């Protein structure tokens, strides 16, 4: 069906990890108590492992929201589009959301090792850590769905989408930094 169809399928595939990655920002405003995943501990280099911004509350909320909203989206799309779509299976969606959040944690770990404080920009790492982890999970669990064009489109569109949504979150008072 062409590039437009590939673009739409790409958005559908990456939608659950996008939701999983964005939800912890909102969750941080909903929970009064936030428990850092690293429990405030430092790594062998003396720096925090992940930092205060990575919490169990955000991780769990992101995982659940990504899975539920992603699956609901797939159900709605499947019922409204008369074309058979091969989308990730429910277990794959869950694993992709988990991988996205683990990718984000990996990005935070790398930033701390580089001496970057919480909220400091790390171009491309900030925008692609979660996406690449989710796509890797999809490739490992349900490789028949992942086409090279979807990866290319996802990698090209994610940085501007990520920057735009972070700027919106900043303007809404959900984030301290616009990136």
Where is each model-derived feature located?
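Interhelical loop and helix-boundary elements at the membrane-water interface
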Residues: 1-70, 74-136, 148-179
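Transmembrane helix interruption/hinge and helix-loop junction motifs
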Residues: 140-148
